C-alpha cells in the first residue's frame, strides 16, 4: 500500500478510524506510531496526509503473528488525485484470472470497465461471485492503494458485444474517446496511436481471442487494430502490456 484510502463514510469531522488489513500494514510494514504521518486519501475524492492520533492494540493474528489494531488519524486531504486516462471494454477471462487482473487495472489508471459477452467467453462467467460489488470492489481498492490514487473504476456488464455496439450504447458510454484501439494478434499496426491528452478506449478479447467478425464490428465503429506481437497472451498479461504501451508519459 502506497496510500491508505478511506471510504467517504469513514471520515467524520476530519478524522478516520480503521482496522483490518490497512491497520495491519501501518503497524507491521510502516511501523506506525502516534504522531507519524501517513499518505492517505478518500475514494473518489482528495488525497493528502493523515497523522496518527491513537492506536488501540488488538490481539495479534494467530496465523501470522502480525500485530493488529484500530488506528485513529486526523485527515488533511486537499490534493487532487490523477484522473483516469483509459477506459476498457473487456471480454472477461475465467474468474481466477479476473481476480488477479482487477487490482492491476486499477493501478494502471482505467476509469470505466465494461465487461462484454463475446463468442469465446464462457457463459458460466456471468454467474460468478466475482461480479458482485462486495467482491470486486476490495480488489480494485487494493490496486488504487498500491498506485497511490483515489479514482475508483466503475464496472458494468453487457452480455452481447454486438448488441452493445450496434444499439449505440458503446457510443453513449464513450462519446469523447480520443482514440479507440482493439488488441488483435497479427495486426498490421506497429506503433501505438497518439491520443494526446484525451482518454483512450481499449477493447481486449477473451483468452481465445476475438473472432474475425468481432474485430470487423469494432473496426467499423472506429477502432484501430494494435498487435503486441505474434505470441498469444493470456488476458491478464495482454491487458497490462497494452495499457503500458498506450500509457501517456507524464
PLM features: residue spans?
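Short, ordered loop/turn segments at secondary-structure junctions
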Residues: 57, 117-121, 230-231
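RNA substrate-binding interface of SAM-dependent RNA methyltransferases
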Residues: 76-180
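Intrinsically disordered, low-complexity terminal tails and inter-domain linkers enriched
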Residues: 56-68, 168-175, 190-191
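N-terminal positively charged helical leader segments and presequences
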Residues: 1-79
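Hydrophobic side chains in well-ordered alpha-helices
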Residues: 26, 98-101, 214
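Active-site/ligand-binding-proximal alpha/beta "capping" segment
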Residues: 175-215, 223-227
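Structured adenosyl-cofactor binding patch, chiefly the S-adenosyl-L-methionine
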Residues: 212-250
Amino acid at each position: 500500500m502506497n496510500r491508505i484510502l478511506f471510504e467517504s463514510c469513514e471520515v467524520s469531522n476530519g478524522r478516520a478510524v480503521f482496522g483490518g488489513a490497512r491497520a495491519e500494514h501501518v503497524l507491521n510494514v510502516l511501523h506506525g506510531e502516534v504522531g507519524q504521518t501517513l499518505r492517505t486519501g478518500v475514494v473518489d475524492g482528495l488525497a493528502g496526509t493523515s497523522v496518527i492520533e491513537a492506536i488501540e492494540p488488538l490481539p495479534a493474528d494467530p496465523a501470522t503473528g502480525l500485530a493488529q489494531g484500530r488506528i485513529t488519524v486526523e485527515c488533511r486531504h486537499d490534493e487532487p488525485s490523477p484522473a483516469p486516462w483509459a477506459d476498457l471494454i473487456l471480454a472477461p477471462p475465467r474468474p481466477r484470472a479476473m481476480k488477479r487482473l482487477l487490482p492491476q487495472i486499477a493501478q494502471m489508471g482505467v476509469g470505466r470497465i465494461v465487461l462484454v459477452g463475446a463468442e469465446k467467453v464462457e457463459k458460466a462467467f456471468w454467474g460468478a461471485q466475482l461480479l458482485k460489488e462486495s467482491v470486486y470492489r476490495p480488489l480494485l481498492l487494493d490496486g488504487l492503494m498500491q498506485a497511490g490514487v483515489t479514482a475508483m473504476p466503475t464496472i458494468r456488464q453487457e452480455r452481447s458485444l454486438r448488441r452493445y455496439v450496434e444499439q449505440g450504447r458503446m457510443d453513449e458510454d464513450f462519446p469523447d474517446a480520443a482514440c479507440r484501439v482493439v488488441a488483435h494478434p497479427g495486426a498490421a499496426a506497429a506503433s501505438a496511436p497518439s491520443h494526446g491528452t484525451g482518454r483512450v478506449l481499449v477493447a481486449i478479447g477473451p483468452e481465445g481471442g476475438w473472432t474475425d467478425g468481432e474485430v470487423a464490428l469494432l473496426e467499423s465503429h472506429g477502432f484501430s487494430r494494435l498487435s503486441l506481437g505474434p505470441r498469444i497472451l493470456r488476458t491478464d498479461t495482454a491487458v497490462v502490456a497494452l495499457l503500458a504501451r498506450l500509457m501517456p508519459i507524464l
